């Protein structure tokens, strides 16, 4: 594998997608860019002491470091990037490990080898969220990819047995939250299998739904979150992957590298979550991206605690398959009050899936890098 650690050009290749193809070229359609991606591989794994699972679950994360603050932060060095992308794995029996990683760029031809207290408002003006009712919507794609965590957050199905969510939903930066050892993922389904007792199909009332729960086998959390939660670098790594004990048998949404905001269709993002002010309801929303940094998307989508961990997605044209495709390009993290030219302004924040994060998450899902070369 190629790459000279610490070399500035090498670092630039790691942090920026390699060989990006213009998303538009001769096509009028907003098209998924083609990327040649870096590789994130485990180098060593060692056992850690069992955690105490003593943290209180937080349904949102706040930070005072806004877009300008993040834009002024230096890019991580190669060694720092390796530290941030190293990760902890928690197993259902309470044991855990730490895995240190290496980061590489493949040579051509190698790819075929194996502050002040404020009341936080997350509703901006008129509440533009939509509660999704009826099994014809809730049980069909893309809404069916949204699931509920037993800790109170939202997650998104990204593979046959995997759920993407926010790290703070299971870990507070110091230890795991209460209930994580017996973490479950809930799938909405009709309350009545045969329809008896359910609302009549012509009724104006929404059909009653319930959650069916599946236990989690193991979780992965990047060390960038665990090491950095005490400062503002942590929010850049507020994501986690959950592996279920059995397949969920539903259609899932693939992850993708987040394009620049100006390349998103209409500059807009979408996500659905289980906001805690509408218990039992799946809530969908969309809005424009207001600002961005390399790791974060700043927007003012209406959201409440409980929506944290929702997969942020867009729909773009897939040139190779000649079809439209939705992909998860970020994870909804939480809320920020920031000072903009001396005036307070608030944003909702999503963690972008960068090329390095894509390589890491994809490896967690696939278990190899060969299947993780297309973002």
From Swiss-Prot:
Gene Ontology annotations of biological process type: proteolysis
**Where do the record's glycosylation annotations fall on this chain?**
93, 199
Cell location? Secreted
Q: Specify the superkingdom.
A: Eukaryota
The family database entries (Gene3D superfamilies) matched by this protein are listed as: Trypsin-like serine proteases
State a single Gene Ontology molecular function.
serine-type endopeptidase activity
- InterPro entries found in the cross-reference section: Glutamyl_endopeptidase, Peptidase_S1_PA, Peptidase_S1_PA_chymotrypsin, Trypsin_dom, TRYPSIN_HIS
Report one GO cellular component.
extracellular region
**What are the positions of the active site?**
168 (charge relay system), 232 (charge relay system), 308 (charge relay system)
Q: Got any disulfides in this one, which pairs?
A: 153-169
Signal peptide location: 1-23
**The enzyme's E.C. designation:** 3.4.21.-
Give the principal location in a single coarse category.
secreted
Keyword field? Disulfide bond, Glycoprotein, Hydrolase, Protease, Secreted, Serine protease, Signal
Family designation: Belongs to the peptidase S1 family.
| Name under which the protein is recorded | Serine protease 23
Q: What is the organism of origin for this protein?
A: Bos taurus
Taxonomic lineage from the root: Eukaryota, Metazoa, Chordata, Craniata, Vertebrata
